[in-house]
From Swiss-Prot:
Transmembrane segments: none annotated. Keywords: Isomerase, Phosphoprotein. Belongs to the glucose-6-phosphate 1-epimerase family. This is Glucose-6-phosphate 1-epimerase. InterPro entries: Aldose_1/G6P_1-epimerase, G6P_1-epimerase, Gal_mutarotase_sf_dom, GH-type_carb-bd. It comes from the Eukaryota. Its EC number is 5.1.3.15. The lineage of its organism: Eukaryota, Fungi, Dikarya, Ascomycota, Saccharomycotina. CDD domains: D-hex-6-P-epi_like. The keyword Isomerase applies. The active site is at H159, E264. One of its GO terms (molecular function) is carbohydrate binding.
């Protein structure tokens, strides 16, 4: 069976290859495993909570309606870090396509985390579509403002944890020449390095990255992950390194930072403002492609 549903999760298996699969937790609609020909592509902490007691550390958590902590908006500032989507149990809406196997999940205030909904009393409908190709994974989001009178202001981000061999031998390409905001230094500047490399904690937001740029994770000169995006102009690059890993109870093993890198496409540098009745769509596509260096434009 290409689609299997349990109380806690939905599992998709590709009809042409049963070793290619994706596991989606209903809590947070979080993809926590994606295997291509038996090989895991995503990083998941061995201490990640998959029981709905807290957001999942690893996989692809969904960030909505706020990225990080907000200090200026009357309602968004009351929400915890990264909002309420990853802290809510989504409704499984069913299968929309047999091949490639495609399913949808929905979230609206009536079923979202009630404590957080009280803090952010807005009207919305989220539809997440997960499509498992034979050689790719696509996660798409549609946000609808279901209010008849109020504007909907929000961020969106796919907090994707990629699995890698060794962070110190890993590079991220095709972000050269982009303006970024360094969340550790609290500074903005243009990244003039040809590739992103890692030897310490990294937490930066690249802004206005053209959708034509395929962001690639490279290990010793070989492409291991390619990320394509639609309508997601910002890209967060994050690795907690040694000290921050030690301080996160659900981050295990503590050396796990060596085997993961977060490349997170989103719309977070500023807010999306959606008029009543309007919809906003975006997606990320995770795949494998030949190494292609896109120079500074």
């Amino acid at each position: 069976m290409p689609i299997k549903e349990t109380d806690k999760e939905v599992v998709l298996t590709h009809p042409a290859d049963e070793t290619t699969s994706v596991h989606i937790l209903k809590y947070g609609a979080t993809v926590y495993s994606w295997k291509l020909k038996s090989e895991e592509q995503l990083w998941l902490s061995t201490a990640a909570k998959l029981d709905g007691s807290k957001p999942v550390r690893g996989g692809i958590p969904l960030v909505f309606p706020v990225f990080g902590k907000n200090s200026t908006d009357e309602h968004l500032s009351k929400l915890p870090q990264h909002g309420l989507a990853r802290n809510s149990t989504w409704e499984f809406l069913g299968q929309t396509k047999e091949n490639p196997p495609t399913v949808q999940f929905g979230l609206k205030p009536e079923i979202a985390n009630p404590e957080l909904t009280k803090l952010w009393p807005m009207d919305y409908l989220l539809i997440l579509t997960v499509e498992l190709g034979s050689d790719y994974l696509k996660t798409a989001i549609e946000v609808e403002n279901t209010s008849s009178s109020k504007e909907l202001k929000f961020n969106w981000l796919f907090h994707t944890y990629f699995r890698i061999e060794d962070i110190e031998g890993t590079m991220v390409s095709n972000l050269a020449g982009m303006k970024l905001y360094d969340q550790l230094l609290k500074e903005s500047y243009v990244d003039k390095h040809p590739v992103v490399t890692f030897n310490q904690e990294t937490d930066v937001i690249y802004q206005n990255v053209s959708a034509e740029r395929a962001i690639q994770i490279v290990d010793k000169g070989v492409q291991i992950h390619t990320l394509k995006r639609y309508n997601l102009p910002d890209t967060v690059v994050w690795n907690p390194w040694i000290e921050k890993s030690q301080g996160m109870a659900d981050f295990e093993p503590k050396t796990g930072y060596q085997q993961m890198i977060c490349i997170e496409p989103g719309h977070v540098h500023d807010f999306i403002s959606l008029a009543p009745g309007k919809k906003w769509n975006a997606y990320q596509l995770l795949c494998k492609e030949e190494l292609k260096y896109q120079a500074i434009q």
